[in-house]
From Swiss-Prot:
It is found in: Secreted; Nematocyst. It comes from Anemonia viridis. GO terms for cellular component: extracellular region; nematocyst. This is U-actitoxin-Avd10a. InterPro entries: ShKT_dom. The keyword Signal applies. Pfam families: ShK (PF01549). Inhibits voltage-gated potassium channels (Kv1/KCNA). Disulfide bonds join C51-C86, C60-C79, C69-C83.
């Protein structure tokens, strides 16, 4: 009986350690993306686009207003409605 309890305890520790590691990695990536976006906004503040579709989510609208459609190639596919609303 004690062997089973020890094995279950070790298995629990392994699962808890793996989940804690993946959660920390996820939080690290989210924070890194947030700071990258802030650095991008601080470095580049183009004149802006007058053509923004208000129905799209606010991130795409904000990036399109800053002129990111012309600067970032991925904007054309990821935020197509905001970039092509003229």
């Amino acid at each position: 009986m004690s062997r089973i309890a020890i094995l279950l305890f070790v298995a629990f520790l392994l699962v808890a350690g793996i989940s804690a590691k993946s959660t920390a990695h996820f939080k690290k990536n989210v924070l890194a993306d947030l700071f990258k976006e802030r650095r991008f906004n601080a470095k580049r503040d183009p004149a802006g686009s007058t053509c923004v579709n208000i129905d799209v989510d606010s991130f795409c609208d904000g990036m399109a207003e800053r002129g990111a459609c012309n600067i970032i190639p991925q904007m054309a596919t990821n935020c197509a409605k905001a970039c092509n609303s003229c």
